Structures are given as C-alpha cells and as structure tokens.
Amino acid sequence: MGKNEKTKKPKPKYNVWQNTAYMLSVAWDTRRSVPLLVVLLAVCTAGKTTAEMLISPAVLSKLESGAPLGQLLGAIGGFTILLFALTALCYYIDHLTMFGRTGVRMELLKRINTKRTRTSYVNLLDEAFRLMYQKGHDACMNNRASGEAFWKSWTDLLTNLIGFGVYLALLS
C-alpha cells in the first residue's frame, strides 16, 4: 500500500441516534431515574452557568446607577446564595445519577454475558466473536468507559443546548 491510498474505516453498524435510543431503552427498563436525572442535571448546570454569566452585569448596573451600598451587597449576596445553592444541587444530582448509571452499566454487562453464554459453541472458538465480546465487555468495565461516558456526553450536550437557548433568549 502506498502513502496516497486511504484505508477506509468500516462503516459503523449503528448510528448515534440508534445507540442513543438503545441506551435510553435499557435505562428506562432498568433505572428509570437515569434519563430524568440527566435532564435535571443539564438544567441545573445551565442555570448555574446562566447565574454566573449574569452576576457581573447585575453588579455593574448597581455600581453605574449609584445604588446604595445595601442594594449592591444585597445583589452580590443574592447571587452568591444562588450560586452556592445551584452548585450544591448540581453536585447532589450528579451523585444521585451515579448509582443509576452503574445499574444500567451492570444491565449492559448482564446482556453481554447472557449473549456469550447462550451462543453456539462454534462462536466461542471464533476469534471475531471473542474480540467483539471483549470490546463490549471493556466498554462497560469502569466509570471511565464508554458505557458510562455516554451519560456524561449527553448531559454536556443538553447543558450546552439549554445554555445556547438561554443565551439566544437574552440576546433577543
């Protein structure tokens, strides 16, 4: 093979939306709280970043308008309390989702192992089957594997979409 020849990657069997639908169905069947907590965490995080974004303009408007010191300190204190509350709520929700996500991951491992134990003996000798089994098993083995990263990615995507919507609403 020459340098100019491109090696084609095999096309994935399933697309992102099919994988998302599958993970949501597994989560809904095993731990219904996981998708709901992912959305709640995204809303909470977007609210926190919105409050962080609005604190400077609020304080500066108080300073520019010559508001009394009590109002200025009240605005700073109000935003501080709001940020503390939202940070604590986000932290709490993030820890709540950990148990559900682990349950979903265990269900995925159970399905992978069930597939392996119920397969034909010939497949157990097939190198391609064993590699696919190992790949699926590795995807669910720990908190940093893709079976767990799925939820973090979708939380981040939802947070960014909500934040973008808030930003657009503030600009209009």
Feature-to-residue mapping (PLM):
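Residues within membrane-spanning alpha-helices of integral membrane proteins
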Residues: V39, I55, I76-T80
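Long, charged/polar-rich coiled-coil alpha-helical scaffolds that serve as structural arms
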Residues: P12-N15, G74-T80, F84, A88, ...
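Transmembrane helix interruption/hinge and helix-loop junction motifs
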Residues: T30, G165-S172
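Juxtamembrane helix-loop junctions of ABC transporter transmembrane domains
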Residues: E52, S56, L83-L125, F129
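Membrane-integrated ABC transporters
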Residues: M1-T49, L63, A67-A75, I93, ...
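ABC ATP-binding cassette signature C-motif
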Residues: T87, S153-T155, Y167
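Short, flexible helix-adjacent loops and helix caps
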Residues: E64-P68, Y121, L170
